[in-house]
Each structure stands twice: as C-alpha cells, then as structure tokens.
Amino acid sequence: MIIVTPRYTIIEDGAINKIEEILKKLNLKNPLVITGKNTKKYCRFFYDIVYYDEILNNLEIELKKYTAYDCVIGIGGGRSIDTGKYLAYKLGIPFISVPTTASNDGIASPIVSIRQPSFMVDAPIAIIADTEIIKKSPRRLLSAGMGDIVSNITAVLDWKLAYKEKGEKYSESSAIFSKTIAKELISYVLNSDLSEYHNKLVKALVGSGIAIAIANSSRPASGSEHLFSHALDKLKEEYNLNINSLHGEQCGIGTIMMSYLHEKENKKLSGLHEKIKMSLKKVDAPTTAKELGFDEDIIIEALTMAHKIRNRWTILRDGLSREEARKLAEETGVI
C-alpha cells in the first residue's frame, strides 16, 4: 500500500500568500481554483476560478473542459475543499487545500463527503492554512471543529473493538496518532484561555486528516459518533426538518453518548464523557439536543438506526432499542 500524505503543510498567519511559492516548488503552473462566492475575496491572483456549486450541481461533469489544468486549489470551507478534492481526483491531478475556516478534518483528509456515503480520494499534496483568516471565521464553525476532533476518541475505541470482536484490520500507529491529537486539544481547551485555540484546532484537524491517510481508512476519525451524525442527516432529509446543525456539532454530541457507552464497559475510561462534554462547552459547542435544535424523539430515533447507516462495527454493535437509546441520551444529559 502506498501512503500519500501532504508534501507541504503551512499553518501560519499570512500563509495564503505562499500559494505561488508552493506551486513553484511542486512545478505546477496552471491551477484551477474552486471556491465559493463568500471566499472568492481570498483569491488574490490571476488563476481561473470556478464556484463549487457549479460542480456540485453537475457531478457527472465534462472532464474534458478541465484537462488543460495541472492541479486544483480549493479555497474556502468544506464544500470548496471537498469539491476541489473530487474534481482533482476525477482529473488525476494534484489537489492543494487552502481552508478559510476549521470546522472538520476534511481540510487534510483523503475523504470526500459531497454525497453519502463518503468515499476515499487522494490526499492533498499541500495544505496552506492561513491562521489569520481562519481566526476571523465564524466562531460557530471553529466550535464545530472541536466536535469533529473529539470524535477521534470514540472512533479509535470503536476501531479497537472491531479488531477484538470482528478481527478487523487495525493500525496501532494511526490509532495512537489520532487519539493523541484529540487528547492534546481537549487538554489545551480545558486548561487555557483559548487565545491560541484556532491555531491548535487547525493543527489537530490537519493531523486527523493525515491519520486517515496513513490508515487508508476513515476509521481513526469516524466511528459510532459519525454514524449517529449521519443518522441525524438522514432524518433531517426524511422529515424535511429545517435544522441547520453542523456536522461537527452533531459528532460532538454523538461522542458524548458513545464515550459513555464505552465507559460502561471499561472502568478505566470513567469520566471520559464528562471531560469531552466540558471541552465542548468551553468552546461554546452544543452539548444537548435542544442546543443542537432537535426534538428528543429525533435523537432517540437516530440512536436506534445509527448502526444500520454503514457496515461498520462499533460500540452500538447490533443496535439500541428505543428504551436503551432514551436512557443513554438522558443519562448523558443530551435530552
């Protein structure tokens, strides 16, 4: 297996001004930029630009329109980055990630989530994260990023469980890397004034994405908490719910509950879910169904169907009954 990780990673104030320098180092001369209408202002150069929604509205794109380019640069939030990764993968050319916020580990991972189920592509060849820009992004997006990082804790616990109970392939190095990233950010959040939170968060999200690339699987960063989040997404669509909850917010609440389930089976983990909850509260991320915008019944239904979302063995095993789901949500304070 060939492990592809970024050749260049720049995380600093003013990093966006180094795009041309990185292009030269990579011997890339004709990039196509994918961005959004709100982030076009950061494209301060004379490259061709396409808005991400033009691609998303037609995923079966005519690739011959873009064959003259030798790389794709995604500048913006999750949709710009994911769309850029997808297009670069389809074209067979490198992708450079230039995030303008830090709401999930998609900024560095080889995973695209523009449709479900998500799928693996090539990891970015370079990541250029301008912390000056990211610091000014909406606070809510940065809070959601914390939710995506804490999910590494339960993702790794689930992965190890699948290894023990189902003989699933397991990478100790990738698991330790992913878990350590999450624990260090939690420790920083709980023991600081958060003055460097945006900087620490970006580095954690980049590390999480690299852990996925090393494992060649989303396992180090996606477990039962992500199944719960995807179940919520499915119910939002099924019931036509006008709820604008973010992926990281949903994963954060999922992590509170799933870590509690792991605690019940392993006394060494005692207090884990409370620690995770406190870290989420510290960055103003939601920790209850009400704060997330969901009725109790939707949370319970999502918990009962989460194990069916994809073929992935987790602490949910063969599923929770409605009674078990309600008890879990109540005991963790989610409802």
UniProtKB/Swiss-Prot annotation:
Chief place of localization: cytoplasm
Catalytic reactions of this protein: sn-glycerol 1-phosphate + NAD(+) = dihydroxyacetone phosphate + NADH + H(+); sn-glycerol 1-phosphate + NADP(+) = dihydroxyacetone phosphate + NADPH + H(+)
SUPFAM superfamilies xrefs: Dehydroquinate synthase-like
Gene Ontology terms describing biological process: glycerophospholipid metabolic process; phospholipid biosynthetic process
Cystine connections: none
Cofactor(s) recorded in Swiss-Prot or TrEMBL: Zn(2+)
Enzyme class: oxidoreductase
Pathway listed: Membrane lipid metabolism; glycerophospholipid metabolism
Annotated keywords: Cytoplasm, Lipid biosynthesis, Lipid metabolism, Metal-binding, NAD, NADP, Oxidoreductase, Phospholipid biosynthesis, Phospholipid metabolism, Zinc
Domain of life: Archaea
Cofactor note: Binds 1 zinc ion per subunit.
Subcellular location: Cytoplasm
InterPro entries attached to this UniProt entry: G1P_dehydrogenase_arc (IPR023002), G1PDH (IPR032837), Glycerol_DH (IPR016205)
Binding locations of substrate: 105, 148, 230
HAMAP family membership: G1P_dehydrogenase_A
Name of this chain's protein: Glycerol-1-phosphate dehydrogenase [NAD(P)+]
Organism field: Methanocaldococcus jannaschii (strain ATCC 43067 / DSM 2661 / JAL-1 / JCM 10045 / NBRC 100440)
Gene field: egsA
